Amino acid sequence: MNDEESHISVLPVMNKQTSLVLQNLKEETENQLKELEKKRSQLHKEEQINLQLVYAINDLRSKTKELKAENEKEDTFLNSFNASGDLTANKKIQLREQSRKLEESLLSYHKKVKEMEKQHRSASSKLELAKLSAQQLQTNVNVLRSQNNPEILQDMISETKDCRSLIAEQLLQSASLLNDFQNDSDRIAKNHSSLIDTSRAHRVSLTNATKNYTHIFDSLLTFTRHDSEDVSTSVEKLTSKKISELEKLFADYCSIEDAFD
């Protein structure tokens, strides 16, 4: 067998090996693309979670304004009460109910803030995991690139770059959102503490005002009772006197009046 015949006999074997290598590369590329698609879906879910967090923060801001407005109304009502010194039973019940509802709202509000912080930490952890996965995909791409098949890998390289860009953008957005959320959380905590203190002050003022009101009422009642007893005593004394004594008292009174005239 000459050299030409030997070369021809080797070609089918080389073509078969090349086909196998290309087939393996194709399968691995498809697997990598599927993995990238999963990561893209995961990033989309993280975006939705972040949007929900933004909406929730805006809702909490709105509720904070409502609580502040409600607290200002209570301040106005309490100031009006202290100025007038008059508090009916219905107003006392209403103020107690408003204070109770305010504390319940604040406790529920604080609990919701804690839940949001937990959700945001979970979202940040998932984003970090997605970043590590993208780095691993890039490593796999570099390994395949070293096999000198740029035509086969071009699509996967492009997908990997897009995925990395998307992850980087998502991480920046999450960092900004986390910073805003932290600032809002600090302000919310201060407002929560302030509202709790104000509510307690309202209850103390209400208690003191009720004590003062009760003391005044008891004093007036005692004074009225004493006056009534004095009048009754005077009437009894007058009725016990005889007609002649009354006439003498009246004459004495008239003489005193004439003397002043």
From Swiss-Prot:
It comes from the Eukaryota. One of its GO terms (cellular component) is mating projection actin fusion focus. GO terms for biological process: actomyosin contractile ring assembly actin filament bundle convergence; conjugation with cellular fusion; mating projection actin fusion focus assembly; mitotic cytokinesis. Keywords: Coiled coil, Cytoplasm. Residues 16-147 form a coiled coil. It is found in: Cytoplasm. This is Uncharacterized protein P8B7.02. It comes from Schizosaccharomyces pombe (strain 972 / ATCC 24843).
